Each structure stands twice: as structure tokens, then as C-alpha cells.
Amino acid sequence: MHMKAINLDGVVMYVSSTDDRGVVDAKTRLYFTQKGSRVFARYGGGSVVRGCLVGTLFGSELVFRYTQLEDSGQIHGGRSTCEVQRKAQTGLRVIEHFTWSTRSGSGTNVFAEIR
């Protein structure tokens, strides 16, 4: 059986699970675009005024760097390696393993598709 390639173009996600060291939360929305293996997203909500990520998707592995302006006025960023999963009932899910570049810490967040 051939699995359909994952495509994030036009997908909107919310943060369904946030690590204690993370900043995004259930109010954060991510708006994805994809061109070939190149993935981009803008995001915001909660304490994130605006954020962007730039990365690549090969198979189910999404790797990106992110930068965000927080409501404190600070700009922070880091890098993430993610597993993208397709769930029959709920759509796409992204399990993000992030490492901050501008502050200490790392952790795991989960994004879920809004359908």
C-alpha cells in the first residue's frame, strides 16, 4: 500500500501540548505553506505576538528554525526536529522537539491540525 506524501500547504494547526520550557500554547495558531520540500509557517497567539519558521520536510521528518517576537518585547528563537504524523480521525499532527538558541532549554510540543 502506497502512503500519500505529507503536504503541509494550507494547513492550520493549534498547539495541543506545550512543554514547560515552551512559549506557544493552546491560543497559538500556525499557518503553513509548502513548496516542494520547503516549509514555511507564520504563527502567533498567547504570549507570541508573531513568529515565523523556515524548514524542510523529507518524508515525515520536518526540520526548521524559528524566530518569534513575544509580548514581553523580547525576540527569541531556536531549532526544531519534528515527526509529522497522519491520523485518520484528526488529521496531521506534528511532534516538535525544540532547542532554544537564545535562552536555555529544550523540550517537546505537539501541534494538531484544525479541520
Q: Predicted regions span which residues?
A:
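N-terminal glycine/threonine-rich, aromatic-flanked beta-hairpin/loop signature
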Residues: 28-56
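Short acidic-glycine loop/turn motifs at beta-strand connectors
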Residues: 58-60
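Beta-sheet ligand-binding and adhesion/scaffold domains
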Residues: 2-31, 35, 62-115
